[in-house]
């Protein structure tokens, strides 16, 4: 069947030192279990704007309500299962994070740490491609 293109939002959360927050996907997930992934990602619901979806996902996944997103880019990501139009945002946030119970937690990574671990099967392919 043809894959419908659906909009997705991603938010990269940095602290003021330039470290990047990543979430750990739970082991029970079908897709990429146990891998580290972009801090926030989710589908835009029907009738929702990108901005509203972003706020909803950030609140659900990290418990943040007060942040200023900046749109970096958008691209199409296609896997064997789906085709996504991804809107990538970033924000700088130094407040407390309250990861959702659905996640296996998360932490800030330095750019060096991320570079050292690329290609080792620690991160999701979608994260590594960006």
What are the residue ranges of the model-derived segments?
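Short loop/turn microsegments at loop-to-beta-strand junctions
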Residues: 8-9, 49, 104
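A short acidic/small-residue loop/turn micro-motif
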Residues: 1, 28-29
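Nudix hydrolase/Nudix homology domain
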Residues: 34, 73, 80-130
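Beta-strand scaffold of nucleotide-dependent catalytic cores
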Residues: 21-24
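Active-site segment of metal-dependent pyrophosphate-handling enzymes
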Residues: 27, 49, 55, 59-96
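A conserved beta-turn-beta hairpin within the catalytic core of GNAT-like acetyltransferases
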Residues: 29-36
